[in-house]
UniProtKB/Swiss-Prot annotation:
It comes from Mus musculus. The modification Phosphoserine is found at residue 418. The SET domain is degenerated, suggesting that it has lost methyltransferase activity. The gene is Prdm10. PANTHER family: PR DOMAIN ZINC FINGER PROTEIN 10, ZINC FINGER PROTEIN. This is PR domain zinc finger protein 10. Disruption phenotype: Embryonic lethality observed during the preimplantation stages. A significant down-regulation of EIF3B transcript seen in embyros and embryonic stem cells (ESCs) and ESCs exhibit severely impaired proliferation and growth failure. Residues 475-487, 1014-1036 have a biased composition (Polar residues). Present in brain, liver, kidney, spleen and thymus (at protein level).
Amino acid sequence: MDPKDESAHVWPTSADHEQSTAQVHFVPDAGTVAQIVYTDDQVRPPQQVVYTADGASYTSVDGPEHTLVYIHPVEAAQTLFTDPAQVAYVQQDATAQQVLPSIESVHGSDPLATLQNPIARLDAKEEEEEEEDEDEDTEEEEEEDAEDTDVDDWQPDPPRPFDPHDLWCEECNNAHSSVCPKHGPLHPIPNRPVLTRARASLPLVLYIDRFLGGVFSKRRIPKRTQFGPVEGPLVRGSELKDCYIHLKVSLDKGDRKDRDLHEDLWFELSDETLCNWMMFVRPAQNHLEQNLVAYQYGHHVYYTTIKNVEPKQELKVWYAASYAEFVNQKIHDISEEERKVLREQEKNWPCYECNRRFISSEQLQQHLNSHDEKLDVFTRTRGRGRGRGKRRFGPGRRPGRPPKFIRLEITSENGEKSDDGTQDLLHFPTKEQFDEAEPATLNGLDQPEQASIPIPQLPQETPPSLEQEPETHTLHLQPQQEESLVPTQTTLTADDMRRAKRIRNAALQHLFIRKSFRPFKCLQCGKAFREKDKLDQHLRFHGREGNCPLTCDLCNKGFISSASLESHMKLHSDQKTYSCIFCPESFDRLDLLKDHVAIHVNDGCFTCPTCKKRFPDFIQVKKHVRSFHSEKIYQCTECDKAFCRPDKLRLHMLRHSDRKDFLCSTCGKQFKRKDKLREHMQRMHNPEREAKKADRISRSKTFKPRITSTDYDSFTFKCRLCMMGFRRRGMLVNHLSKRHPDMKIEEVPELTLPIIKPNRDYFCQYCDKNEMSYFALSKKVALYIAFMVKYLTLQVYKSASKRKAHILKNHPGAELPPSIRKLRPAGPGEPDPMLSTHTQLTGTIATPPVCCPHCSKQYSSKTKMVQHIRKKHPEYAQLPNTIHTPLTTAVISATPAVLTTDSATGETVVTTDLLTQAMTELSQTLTTDYRTPQGDYQRIQYIPVSQSASGLQQPQHIQLQVVQVAPATSPHQSQQSTVDVGQLHDPQTYTQHAIQVQHIQVTEPAPAAPSASQVAGQPLSPSAQQVQQGLSPSHIQGSSSTQGQALQQQQNSSVQHTYLPNAWNSFRGYSAVSAGDTSHESASEIQMMTLPPGQFVITDSGVATPVTSGQVKAVTPGHYVLSESQPELEEKQASALSGAVQVQPSAHSDSLDSTGPSQQQTTQYIITTTTNGNGGSEVHITKP
């Protein structure tokens, strides 16, 4: 509301006011406050008008009760206001504030009288206003003109000098001492509150009480639990305060400041921003309430629990014995009363019948036996314990719910206890016995305390078919699938088992005895009670005629309460409240309904009319219908669920609540529902479980090998200490980390092998709709189409995530291909599920394992190892140089290719599928920009080189540590050697490891061609000349010897590298092949032999492979012959032959007879792949 409008109603304007000025008298105090008295009957919201000292501006702000006028003091005693309509005389004293309606009232009468009676003056003024006959439109125009005049008259205040206590107003471009009088207050948005360091560092198991203060426990904290260290600034002893515990710290001279060398330093625990949560722990006043002890360890102070801290118990600390002497304090002495209380607190086995507590379960069992003598019968109630007497419509628990406790065997009829410690259920008398019994005896009112209390049953209301129950019977009421008390291999004796069984039964019985044992039964309605007083109170409701104050007018039946009478009056009304769930009939009494439902029994069971489910009890089928087939009218306000009963809704509302009022006294876990706490106590803290846990801890677990020694050798990954084999690398790594944490990864040779991962191409099935069968066409056309489709049409990705992003971006709404990880094996007659993934296996990738520097875990990539460190070792995640760079290795592809060739022979290609072959053939004419870079490195430890001079010589070992695979170039370009000559060293001692290279072929020129006889008599090895002992260290290193000079003349030799198409496992069992020697017992090797016309043989068997002159003989099964003019790999089936190896020109070439100086001959390499078992064997490298 505009302040001008408000003032017009309070003090109406007049022509006299506009022509004269007005003065406002006030007391030059801290401010003048006056209450405005309204003269009309119009209802207005509360306002307050704030006037500035010079009267130039004002503002209106809503107040809580009424309108206030604030007049700020100035130096003069009077303030001149330019607008008379806004002026009033204000008088302020210590007791009252008065306001005059106008300045003219003071001129025309006694000012003092007016000030003393402002209300009368206001009434007179109101009468004068009523006499004025003015038009409403004219008044509104005058108000608007007055408002415009007020705005035009407002002038901004002169700029004020800077004062930090002034509030800046950007609209006025000036500062004010408080709220801006023109534009009103600002709209503040406060900062979000942030917890202090002390409160934010509080552990999750603790909480700080907002009202009592101190630190309390949320759950049970065991003894010998350490908290800390204490954090806070260190000050001198004179600066300490008495509101917290004083902790002194002993520091070394290097940790002290210069000024504190001879002064004691104490923790100052009063500032929450500098200390941690331990500042809130209050000191203990005596030994009884102390549960923490303070001590110094190293340079820090810690708190340790000296007893079990129960839930909702406050932590209180005092000094340790030695630390108390250091801080000049005394430890708390233990009085005799405190000793008794402590002994009582150690009794953790309470009895719920008499509130006594015991130290051990055996003492509790002995005490429970005294209660068992009084209770010769133990029954249970139906449902969840809301028992209303014995079931009337069939025995048994509701189907689908497990038994709540162990029910015992009933072997006797008289209620006596059996010898094995079990209890017997008392036999219930039949209807005839109930009629003959006396009322007092049946109610149990006159029975002695320790006598057996017979519990009669209500007269049977079911048909004869339901009451056929034998009087003497034996029940075997054991729980379903009862587990054995002890494991199969246990040290418990039979007495221990019987004692554990008695403890279990007694503990379970006394949990439910209050709900199960109801000996006092009403003869009128059959309701049972645990106490006699409850039965007497109930009997008063069964009033008789003339004995009750309330009487029914229709039948003259008496009642004690109006509620009973109101319930009885329903019998005389036409409304029938009890309806049958099986038929349309309804009844006015519940007992009539129970008699009626007996006609719906079929084979002793009740059938649900909706779902045809069968139940042995009418109460069960009634609950089933109400729960599942009735209208759900009780709607949850938090979610969309609805219920048919209000109690179910209340139970459901606990899910939306954070309150957990039921606390487990053993472990401190909290629950929202009482039944969940009860189930938790039975499942987690029963004596049987505790006995199993204690026995499991005491017994050491014996090791049993899972497999026999014969199967142990068949595994790739195995632990030699435990003689166990594993199918995967990760299983071995986990086994070593758990069983052998001190063993290093380097000591296990299996874990140094590279990790083989499949390499796949992921295609987008939506980018090419015209797919065809490439293999149905001719060979060359299929190769060409395959290449064009792969690189020019199809969208190919190296990961499923990139293909998924492509489909979501370019094909929105399209169905994503199924994940390979979630595929299930195809059934009989079903298509292969891999066809729907649109992927193709292109080979395998061998990567070295990336080891975690903080544990024994291994990963195939650095990314996964970094994720592991961040998750499992967060304390090292932020430290620099904690992640080691893995070693680079070669890519073993299923599509091998010779990367480097000589310009005279052309490039040899080894392929495994047509698609890759087409890609390779057509890529020869492309530039290097379209080729896959081959810049990986391979680590090679040992390469035995077999050389021959005049006869067969022993292999000489040369170490090639690193061989770099160079990118493939055009056949017309010159090829540089990719063997690092500097890596061949002098004879040294090396440790043998796994090899990561499969094929190396080094060619060098021969000065003269050998004759046919020489070739026939020599093995597949280099030239026998001494100058061609090619790759000895002295020659390759370029020494000054004659052999070194001869090596310098062989600058035109080329190096050839090839990937083989199989994984590492395919090279097991390879052996060396020597001429005339079939029993060569050496390490597992791969031998590569080169035939003169460019044809070479890869041997993978231990049998010699002779080649006769003029033809290529059949080799052993598994041998592969690859010709220069034959780009595909053909498997030759043959049998092994004996004899010397003879090499003759093949049918594919005639160049053997005429060899020139430029002819080259290949040096034979034998690549060892033997894995050292313990990593300790050594191979000596000697010079040739």
